[in-house]
Amino acid sequence: MAYQSQDIIRRSATNGLTPAPQARDFQEEVAKLIDVTTCIGCKACQVACSEWNDIRDTVGNNIGVYDNPNDLSAKSWTVMRFSEVEQNDKLEWLIRKDGCMHCSDPGCLKACPAEGAIIQYANGIVDFQSEQCIGCGYCIAGCPFDIPRLNPEDNRVYKCTLCVDRVVVGQEPACVKTCPTGAIHFGTKESMKTLASERVAELKTRGYDNAGLYDPAGVGGTHVMYVLHHADKPNLYHGLPENPEISETVKFWKGIWKPLAAVGFAATFAASIFHYVGVGPNRADEEENNLHEEKDEERK
């Protein structure tokens, strides 16, 4: 079983004349909740992601940090981020699982000029269709979290799929399945928000007064959320943006030029019809016949 076209609610690069796809049935939005306060940085989730998706990154060089690999890539869809910070005169080691946030309003999808290369399912998962990718990299620029990565081998972009192939058959993502401390949870978005509120309340009783849920409104909310000790300072967690938003360039492109492109297409099509009706399809043939007649007269 796999998702069908009827399960898709958005496609990249569809113009104003293309009707929006409709999900065949109501599907609850799903979400992955990552509780960074119980993560031990074991990287089991990284291994599970690599195994399930059959991706193998090259062995990098040790640069003096625990991060390995050092960054996301086309063959590393999730990495552990480690940050040493000082808060309230105490040294803290903050750990965050990094990867696609699956935004409700995805900047990558809006920026993509290749039709159908990026899609969003009714449950909120944002997926890349690599066979449609043209390798332009616009999705990378459009992502406020700097997640997608271009593979130089095939000139296509890749990212976490939230294990959509597992979710469709009722399984949880591979990283959730393998986490030994239960730091990663998966379910409906509402149930994950409820779980997060319970965890935040517990953290506040332990002295973390600024604990909270990271579910940024600037991108319409996300389908990967974090429970943070210091929710008032998300940038402490390896630069997690405080108020991520779709760039003004992407908004301008989709807000103004997209409808203008649709109008231009319609105008061109209408002009072609009027030309056909008013002038007719045989004008070129008539001119060619006249030219042949003139040449025949000259020969005589």
Curated annotation (Swiss-Prot):
Highest taxon above the source species: Bacteria
Organism: Escherichia coli (strain K12)
Keyword DNA-binding: no
GO molecular function list: 4 iron, 4 sulfur cluster binding; formate dehydrogenase (quinone) activity; metal ion binding
Cofactors, names only: [4Fe-4S] cluster
Binding site residues for [4Fe-4S] cluster 4: C112, C133, C136, C139
Cofactor mode of binding and number, as noted: Binds 4 [4Fe-4S] clusters per subunit.
Gene name per UniProt: fdoH
Binding residue positions for [4Fe-4S] cluster 1: C39, C42, C45, C179
Amino acids binding [4Fe-4S] cluster 2: C49, C160, C163, C175
Family matches, as Pfam families: Fer4_11, Form-deh_trans
Protein name (record): Formate dehydrogenase-O iron-sulfur subunit
Lineage: Bacteria, Pseudomonadati, Pseudomonadota, Gammaproteobacteria, Enterobacterales
